[in-house]
Curated annotation (Swiss-Prot):
Residues at the catalytic site: D244 (proton donor), H267
InterPro entries assigned to the protein according to its UniProt record, in alphabetical order: Glyco_hydro_28, Pectin_lyas_fold, Pectin_lyase_fold/virulence
Domain of life: Eukaryota
Basic and acidic residues bias (residue ranges): 45-55
Organism: Aspergillus niger (strain ATCC MYA-4892 / CBS 513.88 / FGSC A1513)
GO biological process: cell wall organization; pectin catabolic process
Name of the protein: Probable exopolygalacturonase X
Enzyme class: hydrolase
Ranges: PbH1 repeats: 199-229, 230-251, 253-273, 326-347, 361-409
Keyword Disulfide bond found: yes
Region (Disordered): 31-55
Alphabetized UniProt keyword annotations: Cell wall biogenesis/degradation, Disulfide bond, Glycoprotein, Glycosidase, Hydrolase, Repeat, Secreted, Signal
Length: 435
């Protein structure tokens, strides 16, 4: 990956912006500059403290962790002490929590027992998502600036041998209503870094994500965040170095604010993929993405929808035929460098045969999309094109707007591929179709 002066300058700015202020009980006040779609509840005060014990010899500390959580639940704070390492070798269901803080000052490390985790991690019922733990309940905060390490290298190597293995997600936020996550350092997740499911009113603030493979086997599917069946989520002030979506809004994600992120090496900030499962209805609406720097990536703004016919992106990712809608999506203010597509909208996800895709157009509509205030330079890999907006039918896309898109290829071109979309609403230079 090339490091430009633009990237260096932006990283310097992001280093200041991505460090969350001291933990605040007022989640609403912590959100800046944009405010969430709906007010976030304030966290109640805590009146007792429990310190988690550690064996200190590499043994599983899960029982100590559960003991502290039960002891300080309903109004306390659980502390993972600085300069201590806590080993987790047991799948932990922590969805019983209420009015509790987890202050992570030290390091939490998951074991590399791949057989155990494949058999015992929590199956989340979407794609192949499984999680090391489930953190949920009401008014739960996890912060402190410490490190959570997923021991991912063994998983990267194993996945290269068998792409059907179940790789755990590092942070399973499942059924949480009211919470603040961060600041934290997340390292070497086997798969996604966050899976946020059936949750609401959660703020992620000051998350530092990194974890590249140390072998020839890539760290794949390491999304920064995937939201699923969740509402009123804020993700802000974070730095993400990964190998897949920086943030992905999965089915039935609503009222999501993402702001002040630096994403490096990713697949962009993505709506979807959606419409993967036949006879299921997927909805993503009311999403605002603001002030993003995106470097060394495949995309910046991305909307990916499966067509109306079965398709296969890979052996472990197949689908098509679902219905639903994408509505009221805004991408506002982005700086890009070495990104393949500044904008990529497709209703043919997983289907390389455009003719077949058009014969079986997606049943999932895209409308009321606003993309504005982009600047920077693409990678040139799609030269002369810098973006693509391809719908499977003019009946399935409407009210897609772009404005102030100042993005060029390294050769100075700024062409777009446009299909089945109202070009009069686009400020970009549509010069080709996907045929």
């Amino acid at each position: 990956m090339r490091l430009t002066h633009v990237l260096s300058h932006t990283l310097g700015l992001l280093a200041l912006g991505a460090t969350a202020e001291a933990f605040s009980r007022s989640r609403e006040a912590a959100c800046s500059p944009k405010k969430p779609f709906r007010p976030l509840p304030t966290s109640s005060s805590r009146d007792k403290t429990c310190h988690v014990r550690s064996h200190g010899d590499g043994s599983d500390d899960s029982d100590y962790i559960l003991s502290a959580l039960h002891q300080c639940n309903h109004g306390g704070k659980v502390v993972f002490d600085e300069d201590k390492e806590y080993i987790i070798g047991t799948a932990l269901n922590m969805t019983f929590l209420k009015n509790i803080d987890l202050e992570v000052l030290g390091t939490i490390l998951f074991t590399n027992d791949t057989d155990y985790w494949q058999a015992n991690s929590f199956k989340q019922g979407f794609q192949n998502a499984t999680t090391f733990f489930q953190l949920g309940g009401e008014d739960v905060n996890m912060y402190g600036g410490g490190t959570i390490n997923g021991n991912g290298q063994v998983w990267y190597d194993l996945y290269a041998e068998d792409d059907l293995i179940l790789r755990p997600i590092l942070m399973g936020i499942i059924g949480l209503n009211g919470g603040t996550i961060g600041p934290l350092k997340l390292r070497y997740s086997p798969q996604y870094y966050h899976f946020v499911a059936n949750s609401s009113n959660v703020l992620f603030d000051g998350i530092d994500i990194s974890g590249y493979s140390k072998s020839d086997n890539e760290a794949k599917n390491t999304d920064g965040w995937d939201t699923y069946r969740s509402n009123n989520i804020v993700i802000q002030n974070s730095v993400i170095n990964n190998g897949d979506d920086c943030v992905s809004f999965k089915p039935n994600s609503t009222n999501i604010l993402v702001q002040n992120l630096h994403c490096n090496g990713s697949h962009g900030i993505s709506v979807g993929s959606l419409g993967q499962y036949k006879d299921e209805v997927d909805i993503v609406e009311n999403v605002y993405v603001y002030n993003i720097s995106m470097f060394n990536a495949s995309d910046m703004a991305r909307i990916k929808v499966w067509p109306g016919t079965p398709s296969a992106l890979s052996a472990d990712l197949q689908g098509g035929g679902g219905s639903g809608s994408v509505k009221n999506i805004t991408y506002d203010t982005a700086l890009i460098d070495n990104v393949d597509w500044a904008i990529e909208i497709t209703q043919c996800y997983g289907q390389k045969n455009t003719t077949l895709c058009n014969e079986y157009p997606s049943s999932l509509t895209i409308s009321d999309v606003h993309i504005k205030n982009f600047r920077g330079t693409t990678s040139g890999s799609e030269d002369p094109y810098v973006g693509t907006i391809v719908c499977s039918s003019p009946d399935t896309c409407s009210d897609i707007y772009t404005s102030n898109i100042n993005v060029t290829s390294p050769d100075g071109t700024n062409d777009f591929v446009c299909d089945n979309v109202d070009e009069s609403l686009l400020s970009v230079n549509c010069t080709a179709t996907s045929d």
